[in-house]
């Protein structure tokens, strides 16, 4: 892991050195970089990305053309290969077809508040995510409350447990969850665990997947880091989802690492919120998990050996 990070930093530093060297000694490099910067700024401005995301890049590129262009090309673009994008979109669309909108629910909302109805109608018609009734929501103002509630519901699992997180840490908070997952897997419950490689890079050892699979837990990694730097490395999975039997779901801002539950304090007191959903709306959480899970092939993952 450390070697990978050092290798990437060396590549970035070397590219920056070369660009600055030519920029200083060759006037035409300055003119070319300015021209490219203008084209790039126009391209960024014309995208559908939120303005809050576009403006910082535009400012950096115009203020420091050479370095700005380099940094944007390395970290500013969300680059996904056509094959990966096609595979994910195909899987997501197939799952969305199973999520039908009850028009009576939209009518009820429209009769009560046209402003809220317009938002719900957009989500349902344009994004394919239905609006639900028959769902209880419990809000947790701190991650510690969410973790305790999550552990209680995991103990009740009878059919399946799906978990997808940006960061998982092998420490006391996740150890409690892992204990439940291992026991449930041994009892015949289907357990799937999915995490982002970069988010967990300093938290998990290289044998984590082996351990999970040895205990009957189907474990996958999103976009594992390769030694050679590539643009796709910047695409990360920041979801925090737990689904239990398709009836109960959890989401929120906390990952499964001790710092999120104030067991450790590397950045001071941490506050993140969480939600527990019980009822029909859990269907969408299930679809979101499965669409990402099934978009990752075995060939996309690091090998056990």
Language model: regions and residue ranges:
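N-terminal localization/anchoring segments of enzymes in phospholipid and broader phosphate metabolism
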Residues: 1-305
């Amino acid at each position: 892991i450390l070697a990978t990070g050092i290798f990437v930093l060396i590549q970035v530093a070397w590219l920056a050195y070369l660009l600055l060297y030519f920029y200083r000694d060759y006037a035409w490099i300055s003119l070319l970089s300015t021209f490219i910067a203008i084209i790039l700024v126009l391209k960024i401005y014309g995208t559908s990305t939120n303005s809050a995301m576009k403006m910082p890049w535009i400012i950096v590129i115009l203020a420091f053309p050479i370095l700005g262009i380099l940094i944007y090309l390395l970290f500013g673009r969300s680059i996904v290969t056509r094959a990966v994008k096609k595979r994910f979109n195909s899987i997501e669309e197939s799952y969305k077809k199973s999520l039908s909108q009850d028009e009576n629910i939209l009518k009820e909302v429209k009769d009560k508040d046209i402003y809220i109805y317009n938002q719900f109608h957009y989500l349902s018609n344009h994004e394919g995510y239905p609006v639900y009734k028959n769902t209880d929501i419990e809000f947790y103002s701190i991650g510690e409350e969410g973790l305790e509630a999550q552990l209680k519901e995991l103990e009740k699992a009878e059919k399946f447990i799906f978990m997808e997180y940006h960061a998982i840490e092998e420490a006391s908070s996740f150890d409690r969850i892992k204990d439940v997952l291992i026991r449930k897997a041994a009892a015949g419950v289907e357990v799937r665990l999915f995490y982002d490689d970069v988010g967990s890079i300093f938290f998990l050892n290289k044998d984590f997947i082996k351990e999970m699979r040895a205990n009957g837990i189907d474990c996958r990694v999103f976009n594992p880091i390769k030694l050679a730097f590539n643009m796709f490395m910047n695409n990360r999975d920041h979801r925090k989802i737990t689904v239990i039997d398709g009836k109960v779901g959890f989401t929120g801002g906390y990952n499964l690492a001790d710092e999120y539950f104030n067991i450790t304090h590397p950045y001071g007191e941490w506050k993140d919120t969480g939600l527990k959903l019980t009822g029909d709306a859990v269907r969408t959480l299930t679809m979101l998990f499965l669409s990402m899970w099934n978009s990752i092939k075995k060939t996309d993952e690091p090998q056990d050996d």
